[in-house]
Amino acid sequence: MAEWLHWRASRRVFPKAEPAPDGGAEAVVVLGFPIKRNGGVHPLQRWRCRIAARSMDSRRDGVMVFTGGAIKRDQPEAEAMARYARDVLGVPKDRIRIETAAGSTWQNIEFSIPLIEHATRIAIASDPMHAARARRYLRLQRPDLAARLAPAADYRFLEAWWLKVPTATHELAAIARRNAGRVIRGLIPRAVSDR
Protein backbone atom coordinates (compact mmCIF):
# COMPACT_ATOMS: atom_id res chain seq x y z
CA MET A 1 0.00 0.00 0.00
CA ALA A 2 2.74 2.49 0.96
CA GLU A 3 4.60 1.68 -2.26
CA TRP A 4 1.51 2.47 -4.35
CA LEU A 5 0.83 5.70 -2.41
CA HIS A 6 4.36 6.94 -3.09
CA TRP A 7 4.16 5.93 -6.76
CA ARG A 8 0.86 7.81 -7.13
CA ALA A 9 2.17 10.89 -5.29
CA SER A 10 5.23 11.06 -7.56
CA ARG A 11 2.87 11.86 -10.44
CA ARG A 12 0.67 14.45 -8.72
CA VAL A 13 0.53 18.25 -8.41
CA PHE A 14 2.33 19.26 -11.58
CA PRO A 15 1.32 21.97 -14.05
CA LYS A 16 -0.69 20.92 -17.07
CA ALA A 17 1.63 22.86 -19.40
CA GLU A 18 4.57 21.27 -21.15
CA PRO A 19 7.80 21.13 -19.11
CA ALA A 20 10.42 23.80 -19.67
CA PRO A 21 12.60 23.21 -22.74
CA ASP A 22 16.16 21.97 -22.33
CA GLY A 23 18.55 24.62 -21.12
CA GLY A 24 17.88 27.44 -18.70
CA ALA A 25 18.41 27.43 -14.98
CA GLU A 26 17.25 24.63 -12.73
CA ALA A 27 16.60 24.52 -8.98
CA VAL A 28 16.08 21.37 -6.95
CA VAL A 29 14.66 22.10 -3.50
CA VAL A 30 15.71 19.46 -0.95
CA LEU A 31 13.30 19.39 1.99
CA GLY A 32 14.74 19.04 5.47
CA PHE A 33 14.36 16.35 8.11
CA PRO A 34 15.89 16.30 11.63
CA ILE A 35 19.40 14.94 11.96
CA LYS A 36 20.12 11.96 14.22
CA ARG A 37 20.75 12.46 17.95
CA ASN A 38 24.47 11.84 17.46
CA GLY A 39 24.63 14.53 14.76
CA GLY A 40 24.75 12.04 11.90
CA VAL A 41 22.70 12.24 8.74
CA HIS A 42 19.39 10.37 9.07
CA PRO A 43 18.56 7.70 6.44
CA LEU A 44 15.60 9.81 5.30
CA GLN A 45 17.95 12.76 4.73
CA ARG A 46 20.31 10.55 2.73
CA TRP A 47 17.37 9.34 0.60
CA ARG A 48 16.30 12.93 -0.09
CA CYS A 49 19.86 13.88 -1.06
CA ARG A 50 20.11 10.92 -3.47
CA ILE A 51 16.80 11.93 -5.02
CA ALA A 52 18.09 15.48 -5.47
CA ALA A 53 21.41 14.37 -6.97
CA ARG A 54 19.78 12.15 -9.58
CA SER A 55 17.15 14.82 -10.34
CA MET A 56 19.68 17.42 -11.50
CA ASP A 57 19.79 17.76 -15.27
CA SER A 58 23.41 17.87 -16.43
CA ARG A 59 22.39 19.94 -19.49
CA ARG A 60 21.29 22.85 -17.31
CA ASP A 61 22.89 25.36 -15.01
CA GLY A 62 21.38 24.63 -11.66
CA VAL A 63 21.45 24.68 -7.92
CA MET A 64 20.32 22.45 -5.09
CA VAL A 65 18.59 24.38 -2.34
CA PHE A 66 18.85 22.53 0.96
CA THR A 67 16.23 23.83 3.37
CA GLY A 68 15.67 23.17 7.06
CA GLY A 69 16.55 24.79 10.35
CA ALA A 70 17.87 23.45 13.63
CA ILE A 71 14.55 21.93 14.70
CA LYS A 72 15.45 19.13 17.12
CA ARG A 73 19.23 19.57 17.24
CA ASP A 74 21.80 22.36 17.34
CA GLN A 75 22.82 21.92 13.71
CA PRO A 76 20.48 23.01 10.90
CA GLU A 77 19.11 20.15 8.82
CA ALA A 78 20.05 21.94 5.60
CA GLU A 79 23.73 22.13 6.54
CA ALA A 80 23.94 18.42 7.38
CA MET A 81 22.26 17.41 4.13
CA ALA A 82 24.35 19.81 2.02
CA ARG A 83 27.55 18.43 3.55
CA TYR A 84 26.41 14.86 2.80
CA ALA A 85 25.54 15.77 -0.79
CA ARG A 86 28.91 17.45 -1.28
CA ASP A 87 31.15 14.97 0.56
CA VAL A 88 29.44 11.67 -0.24
CA LEU A 89 27.46 12.23 -3.44
CA GLY A 90 29.94 14.59 -5.09
CA VAL A 91 27.62 17.56 -5.63
CA PRO A 92 29.84 20.55 -6.49
CA LYS A 93 29.97 23.19 -3.75
CA ASP A 94 29.13 25.97 -6.22
CA ARG A 95 25.78 24.30 -6.98
CA ILE A 96 24.70 24.21 -3.33
CA ARG A 97 22.53 26.83 -1.62
CA ILE A 98 21.46 26.57 2.02
CA GLU A 99 18.36 27.93 3.78
CA THR A 100 18.48 27.37 7.57
CA ALA A 101 15.44 29.17 8.99
CA ALA A 102 12.58 26.85 7.96
CA GLY A 103 10.81 24.89 10.67
CA SER A 104 8.05 23.28 8.58
CA THR A 105 7.32 22.16 5.04
CA TRP A 106 5.36 25.37 4.42
CA GLN A 107 8.41 27.38 5.50
CA ASN A 108 10.76 25.15 3.47
CA ILE A 109 8.93 26.41 0.40
CA GLU A 110 8.36 29.98 1.60
CA PHE A 111 11.98 30.58 2.60
CA SER A 112 13.39 28.89 -0.51
CA ILE A 113 11.47 31.08 -2.94
CA PRO A 114 14.14 33.82 -3.16
CA LEU A 115 16.69 31.12 -4.05
CA ILE A 116 14.60 29.54 -6.83
CA GLU A 117 12.86 32.50 -8.50
CA HIS A 118 15.46 32.58 -11.28
CA ALA A 119 14.90 28.96 -12.31
CA THR A 120 13.04 27.94 -15.44
CA ARG A 121 12.67 24.40 -14.06
CA ILE A 122 11.95 23.61 -10.39
CA ALA A 123 11.93 20.16 -8.80
CA ILE A 124 11.26 19.24 -5.18
CA ALA A 125 13.28 16.40 -3.67
CA SER A 126 11.81 14.41 -0.81
CA ASP A 127 9.91 11.19 -0.41
CA PRO A 128 7.18 11.33 -3.08
CA MET A 129 4.22 11.96 -0.75
CA HIS A 130 6.03 14.76 1.08
CA ALA A 131 7.19 16.27 -2.21
CA ALA A 132 3.58 16.31 -3.47
CA ARG A 133 2.53 18.29 -0.38
CA ALA A 134 5.41 20.72 -0.93
CA ARG A 135 4.41 21.18 -4.59
CA ARG A 136 0.89 22.00 -3.43
CA TYR A 137 2.33 24.57 -1.00
CA LEU A 138 4.35 26.17 -3.80
CA ARG A 139 1.19 26.36 -5.91
CA LEU A 140 -0.59 28.14 -3.02
CA GLN A 141 2.29 30.53 -2.28
CA ARG A 142 3.55 31.28 -5.80
CA PRO A 143 1.45 29.91 -8.67
CA ASP A 144 3.85 31.50 -11.15
CA LEU A 145 6.72 29.38 -9.81
CA ALA A 146 4.53 26.28 -9.52
CA ALA A 147 3.99 26.55 -13.29
CA ARG A 148 7.71 25.72 -13.63
CA LEU A 149 7.51 22.50 -11.60
CA ALA A 150 9.00 19.38 -13.10
CA PRO A 151 9.16 15.88 -11.64
CA ALA A 152 12.09 14.91 -9.47
CA ALA A 153 13.48 11.40 -9.83
CA ASP A 154 11.84 10.55 -6.53
CA TYR A 155 10.13 7.22 -7.11
CA ARG A 156 11.97 3.94 -7.61
CA PHE A 157 10.22 0.66 -6.93
CA LEU A 158 11.15 -0.68 -3.47
CA GLU A 159 13.86 1.95 -2.94
CA ALA A 160 14.04 2.81 0.78
CA TRP A 161 11.01 0.57 1.32
CA TRP A 162 11.57 0.64 5.10
CA LEU A 163 11.05 4.42 5.03
CA LYS A 164 7.98 4.41 2.78
CA VAL A 165 5.58 3.03 5.41
CA PRO A 166 6.32 5.66 8.11
CA THR A 167 6.47 8.52 5.60
CA ALA A 168 3.18 7.43 4.01
CA THR A 169 1.61 7.21 7.48
CA HIS A 170 2.85 10.70 8.33
CA GLU A 171 1.51 12.18 5.09
CA LEU A 172 -1.85 10.40 5.41
CA ALA A 173 -2.16 11.90 8.91
CA ALA A 174 -1.40 15.35 7.46
CA ILE A 175 -4.11 14.85 4.83
CA ALA A 176 -6.59 13.76 7.52
CA ARG A 177 -5.78 16.86 9.61
CA ARG A 178 -6.24 19.12 6.59
CA ASN A 179 -9.56 17.50 5.67
CA ALA A 180 -10.77 17.66 9.29
CA GLY A 181 -9.98 21.38 9.31
CA ARG A 182 -12.12 21.88 6.21
CA VAL A 183 -15.03 20.05 7.82
CA ILE A 184 -14.73 22.06 11.02
CA ARG A 185 -14.54 25.35 9.11
CA GLY A 186 -17.68 24.31 7.24
CA LEU A 187 -19.53 23.79 10.52
CA ILE A 188 -18.73 27.25 11.91
CA PRO A 189 -21.39 29.84 11.06
CA ARG A 190 -20.11 32.50 8.65
CA ALA A 191 -20.66 35.39 11.10
CA VAL A 192 -18.49 33.65 13.72
CA SER A 193 -15.73 32.64 11.31
CA ASP A 194 -15.36 36.20 9.95
CA ARG A 195 -14.43 37.67 13.34
Locations of the language-model features?
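A structural signal for short, hydrophobic/glycine-enriched beta-strand patches
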Residues: 7-169
